[in-house]
Amino acid sequence: MRKILKLFLPIIMCLSITFTSTAQPKDSFISEEVQEICVKYGEEYGICPELLMAMIEKESSGRPDVENGGCKGLMQISDRWHKDRMKRLGVTDIYDPDGNIHVGADYLAELFEKYEDVGIVLAVYHGERNAETKTELSDYADWILTRSAELERMNGK
């Protein structure tokens, strides 16, 4: 009996850890309006809306008025670096949630086209050094992908 217990105890422990780590996350604090915008541009650019929502949670905690080091709004867009993109997309107010997410999704789509690997795309978006040559997933990318998966589960995907 003890041999059987010793054999199955590690398996039971691993299963309990696995099921505990996949428990439902707390509700997203992203507003319904922002979620709808993420769905709109997710569909337009072929990007998972939950990925956009996870990025917004990480970049700005869902606050459209945030500014950090010249990066602004929900997706922390630099109007200095994305001036041409903003003009092309007709975005005049980078703090406007629709315009900010539009610019962010357009930039992400460009990065996906160039790099294809979501880990590299997120690292480049985040401005990490040597992002194109990294072989390991950055902490930023890992957080975004984990949260995106949680949001997908919350949305029944």
Where does each model-flagged region fall?
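A mature extracytoplasmic/lumenal domain signature
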Residues: I56, G70, S78-W81, H126
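Non-catalytic cell-wall polysaccharide-engagement segments
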Residues: R2-I37, Y41-Y45, R63, R80-K157
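Glycine-rich, phosphate-binding/catalytic loops in enzymes
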Residues: C71-L74, Y140-D142
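Secreted/periplasmic proteins that engage bacterial cell-wall peptidoglycan
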Residues: I47-K72
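Structural recognition of the beta-strand scaffold that forms the well-ordered cores
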Residues: A54, L74-Q76, V121
